[in-house]
């Protein structure tokens, strides 16, 4: 059994990034809600495998009576504790310090000065000042701040606007940082978390994906037993890896249902069948439901409404297919499997403690009501995208499948702004295919990689507005598409990709000349945050 780090989640949108960074250090960790009891904490630590505790951030204020605090037992276990942002504030508040509302909110990049040569920050820095002070470039997101240290703590870090940006009680191995080491904007954040879990906690670096496969296979077999499972197969990375993992566990007990809702990428239906039936030898039922989906989406322009309609129609299709399978007396279909991953859960406010603020609903999480009559199997629910890809490779899936850019469950339905129409989808399919084709074709000289491999996600978006153009001697009045390409390591934050002008020029020229009905191409230069990766 692995040694473990316990992460208590107070509802931050980026809590799961803490888990991701720790797993990158090959240390096993689990996320649990912050409102667990003292008895639960003591029982969790009873096997001697608990090596440390991390308290996450939150949008709440610790001095309000109704907000959650850490279970007091956390500070009595004798293991190291790290508080991040709100986690530091609740540590200070509960141990006798003072937390107050700041006069100004600190959100964004900041330069933090390290103090006191603590075990957590010793030797970790981005640069030194002329006076020789070690400085860290970090990401802040807070309004409240610690104004008085608890007894036994010393100052560990500060900024100009936050005099106590870090604190340490090295005797008890309690540490707090006001900034977020888990996000990529904190350049040395991974090193800080590695220092905590490996050096201060002394946890073994023995968490590898091969271990996850064996444990997940065992868990799936125990969950499912002799029941049969159906899985909604989209051809994307998540559902593909989920299918391969479940197939590894239960083989012929898995039936994949591939729904062609009329909102897939160009030729995707045929490619999915070739890949899964021809190469993986899985059982796949293909359902042509384009008319059903497009009919229900007619006249609907609200993004949330579209997502919910698509989710609802998936339920109807699955109910119909499940009924067919259940009618066979020799089979017992009891489970619906999904390729839900951590970012889906987080952005839907569906983290384990249900305290995260909802940004937008996700197709995988919110589209399946209990009336489906099937239990939910989500073997990738605790994994981030990079871990899912690593798992896919370990399962023997082809590289091009595993490293294909993610595609949303609602498909082009959330890449067509406003009302979804078949003509719009046909135009967008062709424009998107050209964009992806040229990303594969253009090679970056410095790295030797294609721009498809250098971007994390790229796609075209259909804008239901027309602009005036000129083709030959004639005037055109046609639609506009926007190109979107981002670079990210975790999909929680993302930067827009600085594609070469020559590439953008080629893509624009091809789309305008080859896709009749489009006469203008734009490029989206928004990062996440404040924008999301998808437009809807």
From Swiss-Prot:
The chain positions of domain GMPS ATP-PPase read 207-404
Question: Broadest EC class?
Answer: ligase
The UniProt entry, under InterPro entries, shows:
Class_I_gatase-like, GATASE, GMP_synth_C, GMP_synth_GATase, GMP_synthase, GMPS_ATP_PPase_dom, NAD/GMP_synthase, Rossmann-like_a/b/a_fold
Cellular component GO terms, alphabetically?
cytosol
GO molecular-function term, one example from the UniProt record: GMP synthase activity
Top-rank taxon:
Bacteria
Q: Which SUPFAM superfamilies match?
A: Adenine nucleotide alpha hydrolases-like, Class I glutamine amidotransferase-like, GMP synthetase C-terminal dimerisation domain
Any idea which UniProt keywords this protein has? Answer: ATP-binding, Glutamine amidotransferase, GMP biosynthesis, Ligase, Nucleotide-binding, Purine biosynthesis
* Name under which the protein is recorded: GMP synthase [glutamine-hydrolyzing]
């Amino acid at each position: 059994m692995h040694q473990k780090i316990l992460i208590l989640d107070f509802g931050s949108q980026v809590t799961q990034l803490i888990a991701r960074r720790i797993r990158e250090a090959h240390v096993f960790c689990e996320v649990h809600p912050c409102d667990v009891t003292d008895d639960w904490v003591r029982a969790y630590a009873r096997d001697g495998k608990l090596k440390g505790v991390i308290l996450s951030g939150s949008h709440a204020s610790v001095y309000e009576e109704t907000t959650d605090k850490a279970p007091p037992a956390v500070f009595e276990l004798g293991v190291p504790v790290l508080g991040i942002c709100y986690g530091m504030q609740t540590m200070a508040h509960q141990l006798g310090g003072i937390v107050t509302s700041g006069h100004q909110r600190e959100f964004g990049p900041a330069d933090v000065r390290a103090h006191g040569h603590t075990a957590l920050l010793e030797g970790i820095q981005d640069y030194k000042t002329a006076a020789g002070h070690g400085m860290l470039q970090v990401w802040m997101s807070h309004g409240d701040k610690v104004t008085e240290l608890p007894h036994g703590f010393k100052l560990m870090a500060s900024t100009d606007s936050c005099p106590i940006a870090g604190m340490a009680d090295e005797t008890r191995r309690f540490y707090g940082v006001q900034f977020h080491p888990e996000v990529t904007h904190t350049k040395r954040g991974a090193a800080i978390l590695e220092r905590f879990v490996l050096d201060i906690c002394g946890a073994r670096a023995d968490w590898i994906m091969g271990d996850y496969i064996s444990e997940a296979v065992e868990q799936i077999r125990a969950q499912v037993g002799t029941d049969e499972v159906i899985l909604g197969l989209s051809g994307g990375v998540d559902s593909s890896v989920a299918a391969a993992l479940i197939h590894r566990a239960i083989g012929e007990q898995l039936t994949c249902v591939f729904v062609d809702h009329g909102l897939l990428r160009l030729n995707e239906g045929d490619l999915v069948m070739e890949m899964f039936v021809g190469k993986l030898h899985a059982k796949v039922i293909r359902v042509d439901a384009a008319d059903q989906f497009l009919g229900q989406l007619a006249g609907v322009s609200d993004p949330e409404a579209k997502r919910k309609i698509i989710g609802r129609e998936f339920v109807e299709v699955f109910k119909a297919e499940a009924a067919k399978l259940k009618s066979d007396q020799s089979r017992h279909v009891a489970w619906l499997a999904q390729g839900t991953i951590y970012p889906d859960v987080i952005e839907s406010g569906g983290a384990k403690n249900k305290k995260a603020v909802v940004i937008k609903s996700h197709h995988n999480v919110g589209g399946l009501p209990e009336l489906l009559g099937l239990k939910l199997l989500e073997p990738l629910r605790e994994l981030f995208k990079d871990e899912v890809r690593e798992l896919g490779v370990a399962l023997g899936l082809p590289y091009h499948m595993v490293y294909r850019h993610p595609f949303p469950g609602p498909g082009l339905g959330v890449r067509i702004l406003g009302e979804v129409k078949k003509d719009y989808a046909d135009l967008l399919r062709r424009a998107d295919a050209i964009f992806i084709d040229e990303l594969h074709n253009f090679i970056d000289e410095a790295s030797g990689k294609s721009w498809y491999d250098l971007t994390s996600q790229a796609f075209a978006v259909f804008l239901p507005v027309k602009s005036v153009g000129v083709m030959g001697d004639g005037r055109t009045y046609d639609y506009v598409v926007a190109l979107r390409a981002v670079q990210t390591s975790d999909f929680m934050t993302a930067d827009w990709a600085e594609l070469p002008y020559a590439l953008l020029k080629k893509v624009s020229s091809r789309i305008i000349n080859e896709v009749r009905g489009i006469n203008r191409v734009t490029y989206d230069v928004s990062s996440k945050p404040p924008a999301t990766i998808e437009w809807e």
